[in-house]
Amino acid sequence: MARVTVEDCIDKVENRFELVLLASHRARLIASGTPITVERDNDKNPVVALREIADETLTPEDLKEDFIQSLQKHVEVDEPEAEAVPALSSAPDAAQSDAMGDVQFDRMTEEDLLRGLEGLVPPAATDDDGE
């Protein structure tokens, strides 16, 4: 790449990292068949992309927007909701309280838990541990 081309581009895109991203994106577009806006002059696609940016035949803002759109997987569309979500009441209604009254949980004391754990048998030792 010609140093003159890169130095001409720095006037248009101040950040070198952003310049690399934009020029590489444009070079990929050229490789995929997008028509070029400057004479090729036997240059490769990255050099042509830098020359397009330097000659201002493409604006960096348009390239940046196109680059962002190429990376997006889902495009969000802001649409108003059809109807508002109903607000939750702070007090449960009668149907909910009846349903919750039918639910019972098993309660276990600490002694019952310890007795249950003592009744467990450890797994048998295997010969895989020591060869």
Curated annotation (Swiss-Prot):
UniProt keyword annotations, A-Z: DNA-directed RNA polymerase, Nucleotidyltransferase, Transcription, Transferase
Cellular component, GO annotation: DNA-directed RNA polymerase complex
Feature: compositional bias, Basic and acidic residues: 104-115
Annotated EC: 2.7.7.6
Entry-linked InterPro entries: DNA-dir_RNA_pol_omega, Pol_omega/Rpo6/RPB6, RPB6/omega-like_sf
UniProt keyword annotation of Nucleotidyltransferase present: yes
Catalytic activity line of the entry: RNA(n) + a ribonucleoside 5'-triphosphate = RNA(n+1) + diphosphate
Region called Disordered, residue ranges: 78-131
GO MF term set: DNA binding; DNA-directed RNA polymerase activity
Single Gene Ontology BP annotation: DNA-templated transcription
Protein function: Promotes RNA polymerase assembly. Latches the N- and C-terminal regions of the beta' subunit thereby facilitating its interaction with the beta and alpha subunits.
Record family assignment: Belongs to the RNA polymerase subunit omega family.
NCBIfam families xref list: rpoZ (TIGR00690)
Summary of subunit composition and partner proteins: The RNAP catalytic core consists of 2 alpha, 1 beta, 1 beta' and 1 omega subunit. When a sigma factor is associated with the core the holoenzyme is formed, which can initiate transcription.
Name of the protein described by the UniProt record: DNA-directed RNA polymerase subunit omega
